[in-house]
Amino acid sequence: MRPYLLLTPGPLTTSDSVKETMMTDWCTWDEDYNLHIVQELRKELLGIATKTPEEYTTVLLQGSGTYCVEAVIGATIGKNNKLLICSNGAYGDRMGNIAEYYHLDYDMLAFEETEQVSVEYVDDYLGNNSDITHLSLIHISEPTRRSYI
């Protein structure tokens, strides 16, 4: 079999096991796909994200990172809300552009591209700005391959 290259933006390396898994045709209407992959993934994500998974759900989005970020910001931040964006580079700045496009009220805390977001600084900022209803940040960046939290 001819080896294929996975061409995506960013410095992404793809292991042989991932390439092998990609060779399987998963149909979105198949029970195996929906029950054994999608539902399990949603359940696992809830287990990571909250201590009370019965109060929340997850929605999987297929698209670029910017597509997913815009979908979440556009669908969850209302005109009466205020968003705090913790920006540590181009992706965080892009969230500001998205918020402006949707005419949303937001503040932005700027951190260096290779700097972790300071939990203490954000906590202090939130304590002094009670009008903020939502917080957003990029937890990992493809260009730098760093985790920021």
Descriptions of predicted regions:
Residues 58, 83, 106-107:
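Hydrophobic anchor at the start of a short beta-strand
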Residues 138-149:
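Single conserved hydrophobic/aromatic residue that forms the stacking wall/gate
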Residues 103-137:
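PLP-dependent aminotransferase-class I/II
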Residues 55, 80, 131-132:
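A general structural motif
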